[in-house]
A protein has these predicted regions:
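Fe(II)/2-oxoglutarate oxygenase catalytic core
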Residues: 1-127, 131-157
Length: 157
């Protein structure tokens, strides 16, 4: 990746950590992942997707670091695909509800956030803490392409 593009990404990650009041310290970038989601009308599930997951793990990587921040940069034009929405579960509201209800069943759907349409614009940049649950909904037409990255730092203490 050209140095000037990597610098713009690094600046964006640092600013998001400040703006989001996350203050995650990081000093290592994992290899970027070029991700293609295709519409597959012949398949049982008609489009590529990632189901709910986090990018973080309790495991420390061989380099002594762990994932702290994640990002995705949109490489497709918005009219090149349908579906493929980036979604996340708003952690604070859900965790507060879990604490107040104990073992009661909770409708998690009310805590799901969907990135605005502007996030589908080519070049849009979504940055979030790696522990946030997120997914990409199935692509229902065309092809969605993104560049995904993870930023490592020392384990939390």
């Amino acid at each position: 990746m050209p140095a000037e593009i990597q610098q713009k990404i690094t600046d964006g990650i640092n600013q998001a950590s400040i703006d989001g009041n996350w203050m995650h310290q990081w000093d290592h970038i994992e290899n970027h992942q070029y991700t293609i989601y295709n519409h597959r009308p012949e398949a049982e599930v008609t489009g590529d997707f990632y189901t709910w997951h986090t990018d973080a793990s309790d495991r420390v990587q061989p380099n002594g670091k762990m994932r702290k921040l994640s990002s995705t940069i949109q490489l497709s034009e918005p009219d090149e695909y349908e579906g493929g929405h980036f979604q996340w579960i708003e952690p604070n509201g859900l965790f507060d509800k879990l604490k107040s209800t104990g073992t009661q069943t909770i409708d998690v759907d009310q805590y799901i956030q969907t990135a605005p349409f502007s996030a589908k614009e080519k070049g849009s940049f979504i940055i979030f803490p790696s522990f946030v649950h997120h997914q990409v909904s199935p692509v229902t037409r065309g092809r969605r392409i993104s560049l995904v990255s993870w930023y490592h730092g020392n384990p939390y203490v």
